[in-house]
């Protein structure tokens, strides 16, 4: 019985090492864009605060002080470059975004760049958005943002009130994108291998499985 017991002990230890939470891994960073640096009709992007929790959920809090609510003509798009390469994703050569977190008035959508075009048909469960106190909050788990530990991002806002929409961008066009490092335990990105999940299901007292 030594062999099975030893194998079970190794599996149990591996479960705990892989799946047990690591405290204090959350992270946050502030960013700033100039106030009133765009046409008055545009949603004015100013302070941006990005954070993540230990589960790898990344939240973008975007201050728009000239809006108490988003108008039906307002569009805000947050573009994420997950691989840091301008030659991949959409808008190649300029930014290369793989993901887009968008809001049009009160409709929140999640986009993936598929073969150079945006696909907004599949919304991940981790994605969500809200607007309150002149602050737009967009959230998604980094697993749904390519699983990268460093995310490069840009934000664009527009108000389509006529033939000539008003825009604001953060950071400004012609400057480098902002970058955020996600600090979270490995299990926030990695799913345990099949054999380990099976061992943990059979011996729950020795393992703590996190549902995915």
Sequence positions of predicted segments:
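Extracellular structured ligand-interaction cores
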Residues: 55-57, 73-77, 98, 124-128, ...
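Short, well-ordered strand-loop elements centered on a beta-strand within folded domains, enriched
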Residues: 89, 106-117, 152-155
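Bacterial N-terminal signal peptides that target proteins for export
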Residues: 1-11
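Acidic/polar low-complexity flexible segments
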Residues: 82-98, 144-201, 205-212
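Surface-exposed, glycine/proline- and aromatic-rich loop segments on solvent-exposed faces
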Residues: 26-107, 160-167
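Hydrophobic residues embedded in beta-strands of well-ordered beta-sheets
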Residues: 56-58, 106-109, 134-136, 207
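Acidic, glycine-rich flexible loop segments
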Residues: 113-145
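Bacterial N-terminal signal peptides
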Residues: 9-21
């Amino acid at each position: 019985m030594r062999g099975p017991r030893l194998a079970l002990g190794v599996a149990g230890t591996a479960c705990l090492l892989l799946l047990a939470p690591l405290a204090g891994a959350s992270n946050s960073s502030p960013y700033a864009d100039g106030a009133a640096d765009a046409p008055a009709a545009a949603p004015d992007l100013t302070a941006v605060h990005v954070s993540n929790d230990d589960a790898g959920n990344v939240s973008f809090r975007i201050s728009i002080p000239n809006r108490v609510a988003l108008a039906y003509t307002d569009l805000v798009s947050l573009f994420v470059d997950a691989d840091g390469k301008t030659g991949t994703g959409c808008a190649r050569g300029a930014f290369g975004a793989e993901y887009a977190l968008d809001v049009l008035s009160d409709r929140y959508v999640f986009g993936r760049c598929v073969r150079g075009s945006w696909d907004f048909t599949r919304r991940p469960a981790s994605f969500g958005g809200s607007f309150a106190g002149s602050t737009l909050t967009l959230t998604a788990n980094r697993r749904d943002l390519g699983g990268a530990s460093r995310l490069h991002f840009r934000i664009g806002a527009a108000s389509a009130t006529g033939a000539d929409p008003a825009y604001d961008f953060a950071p400004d066009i012609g400057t480098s994108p902002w970058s955020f490092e996600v600090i979270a335990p490995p299990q926030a990105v990695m799913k345990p291998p099949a054999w380990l999940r099976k061992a943990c299901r059979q011996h729950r007292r020795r393992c703590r499985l996190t549902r995915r």
